[in-house]
Amino acid sequence: MTPGSIQRTLVCLSLGLGLVPGAVTAVERSIYGLNEYIELFDLNLQVAAKLDTGAKTASLSARDIERFKRDGDDWVRFYLAIDEAHEHPIEKPLARISKIKRRAGDVAANDSKTYTARPVIELDVCMGSALRRIEVNLTDRSAFQYPLLVGSEALKAFDALVDPGAKFVAGKPGCTIAANSAE
C-alpha cells in the first residue's frame, strides 16, 4: 500500500463513519514513514530520524553530557554525537530528568537498577511542514543508525500516523519559525 492509498482509505473510512448515526469521525492525521528527515531548529541541523511508536520519548545522540546551574536554574551542556554536527558545546535549560527502562540484555545479574536517568531538553523540530516543540532526552546513540529517535509523545504532538513500510514520506523539512504551533 502506498502512502497515498493509505490516506485515501482513511478519508473513505472517515466519510463512511459520518453515515452511521452516533459515530465519531476520524481526526485528520498526517502519515509519515518509519524514517523521516527532521530539522532541529534550535541546533540549526537536519538529521534522519527513526519514528518509533514503541518508545515513549524522543532521544537525541549526545556525548559529554553534564548538568550545571545557571542563575539558580538547572541546565545541561552536551556535544552532539553526530558525524556532521558541530564540535562546540550546546547549552540548554533542563526540562526534567527522564527514567528510561533498560533492556534486559543491558542489565547485569547483580545490578538492581532497571532504568537509566537521562536529562531532557525541549527543542523545536520540523517534520515535513509541521513545526512542534517536543521533549528530547539526551543519550549516546552513536551505535545506532539514526541519531534521533522520535517516540510516541512527540508523534502525538505531530498528529502522526506511522507507516512502517514507507520511508521519508514527508520529504525534506520545510518550516519557518513563524509556523510554530501545536494547534
Predicted regions and their residues:
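N-terminal secretory signal peptides that target proteins for export/translocation
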Residues: 1-5
